[in-house]
Amino acid sequence: MPRKGPAPKRPLVSDPVYGSPLVTQLINKVLVDGKKSTAERIVYGALEGARAKSGGDPVAALKKAMDNVKPSLEVRSRRVGGATYQVPVEVKPGRSTALALRWLVGYSKARREKTMTERLQNEILDASNGLGAAVKRREDTHKMAESNKAFAHYRW
């Protein structure tokens, strides 16, 4: 670990269209090979499509989707006396947001729609309605933590 301590968190700039730091994080998560304008086009297109389909505020739909995808518990491997236990731990807020965005974008890429814009739009709408693969991933994570509750005393 560095002697100076952990590096300070850099402030997140809100995106110019919606003024939301969450949209900026989503753009950065969609980003591939440094092509920021392409990532922005995909995210803004998905949010506009979500506005057209749901008829509401797309940022509100994104926030609702994030709330439905954010995990509150996860399991971490802990080695004790030659055995490896899956120990349930609470997820810090920053990590839960990062995981939720990673899952949303990852499962968007795995969908069957033609363009990434459509895939992301539909995954956001599904997640805001409590459906979709990203929400299922959160439920699986919570189920795993619940089934390993017996090892919670190994927490660190």
UniProtKB/Swiss-Prot annotation:
Gene Ontology, cellular component aspect: small ribosomal subunit
GO biological process, any: translation
Gene3D superfamilies linked to this entry: Ribosomal protein S7 domain
Keyword annotations: Ribonucleoprotein, Ribosomal protein, RNA-binding, rRNA-binding, tRNA-binding
Short name of any one Pfam family annotated for the protein: Ribosomal_S7
Record-linked CDD domains: uS7_Bacteria
UniProt-listed InterPro entries: Ribosomal_uS7, Ribosomal_uS7_bac/org-type, Ribosomal_uS7_CS, Ribosomal_uS7_dom, Ribosomal_uS7_dom_sf
An example Gene Ontology molecular-function term: structural constituent of ribosome
Record's subunit section: Part of the 30S ribosomal subunit. Contacts proteins S9 and S11.
Role description: One of the primary rRNA binding proteins, it binds directly to 16S rRNA where it nucleates assembly of the head domain of the 30S subunit. Is located at the subunit interface close to the decoding center, probably blocks exit of the E-site tRNA.
NCBIfam families the record matches: rpsG_bact (TIGR01029)
Family recorded in the similarity comment: Belongs to the universal ribosomal protein uS7 family.
Name assigned to this protein: Small ribosomal subunit protein uS7
Source species: Paenarthrobacter aurescens (strain TC1)
Origin organism lineage: Bacteria, Bacillati, Actinomycetota, Actinomycetes, Micrococcales
